[in-house]
Design a protein with these regions (language model features):
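Charge-rich, well-structured scaffold segments of protease-associated domains
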Residues: 2-152, 168, 175, 184, ...
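Short amphipathic
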Residues: 162-170
Length: 261
């Protein structure tokens, strides 16, 4: 049966998510941990797709895509990435489009599973009162012994130019929503990546945090509300700093951010 249903019947709380860089399957439980871990590892290791299951999931995902496309905060975020990046996969919607998922077949999914669902491309993370040696033994027992080739990824060439300076989209909202983004040179792996992340987070707090002079000035003038904030994201091959929220005068707020920076 469905692995997530089996995990639920076994007392676990399973779920899954896909981001721009990762697909993850996980569960929480207070008992039967080893058994649940074996179920999860078997689930991701042994693919099984039929035309019926693909058609069913296509309908569900299509509904989710339509719902997300009607969400203002998601639209402003995806528009930001499309404006910032020329070729990075980050500019492509994670769930795809209704048209693109219509082309998916069981063969497509088997090919993707073979390419990406390989132990060489996986990470297993366990948090709790467990013994690492026992976890490693379970993983070695369940996961395939053979290791595929390390996948060479091509995220395209990105320079510091943006695709579009500004994009507007009309939607039914009580107050305009906006985001402004700044492309940053991506750091290398390891310590450089962590250092960039820490420095950028500190910079965001100093410049955009709710105790910053900029935030207080804009708030006192009624130009922003509690939704205003900023952050820093790193994805494979790219990095960017962003700020935004709700405002009746987004252009004024953006100019103030640029002046402060």
């Amino acid at each position: 049966g469905n692995a997530l249903q089996v995990l639920s019947q076994n007392g676990a709380e399973p779920n899954a998510f896909t981001s721009n860089a990762t697909t993850a399957y996980y569960f929480d439980c207070t008992e039967h941990f080893e058994e649940n871990l074996k179920i999860l590892l078997s689930f991701v290791s042994v693919p099984y797709f039929t035309q019926e299951s693909v058609d069913k999931e296509r309908g569900i995902i299509g509904q989710e895509i339509r719902m997300v496309e009607d969400t203002p905060d998601w639209r402003v975020y995806t528009n930001l990435l499309e404006c910032l990046y020329h070729s990075s996969p980050a500019r492509v919607a994670i769930a795809g489009t209704v048209e693109s998922i219509a082309e998916i077949t069981p063969e497509t999914l088997y090919a993707c599973h073979k390419a990406f669902y390989d132990p060489a491309n996986m990470m297993l993370c366990v948090v709790g009162d467990v013994k690492p040696d026992e976890i490693a033994a379970i993983a070695e027992e369940i996961l395939p012994e053979s290791r595929g080739e390390v996948i060479e990824r091509d995220y395209g060439q990105e320079d510091m130019r943006v695709v579009e300076k500004c994009r507007r989209e009309a939607m039914e909202v009580s107050m305009p929503q906006f985001l402004v983004g700044f492309k940053c040179p991506p750091a290398a792996d390891g310590a450089a990546l962590m250092r960039q992340d820490i420095i950028a987070d500190i910079a965001c707090d100093i410049l955009l945090g709710d105790s910053s002079p900029l935030y207080q000035r804009l708030y006192d003038k009624g130009l922003i509300n509690g939704s205003f904030g900023g952050g820093f994201d790193q994805l494979p091959g790219i990095a960017y700093l962003y700020a935004g929220g709700d405002s009746n005068e987004p252009e004024t707020v953006v100019r103030a951010i640029l002046d402060e920076a």
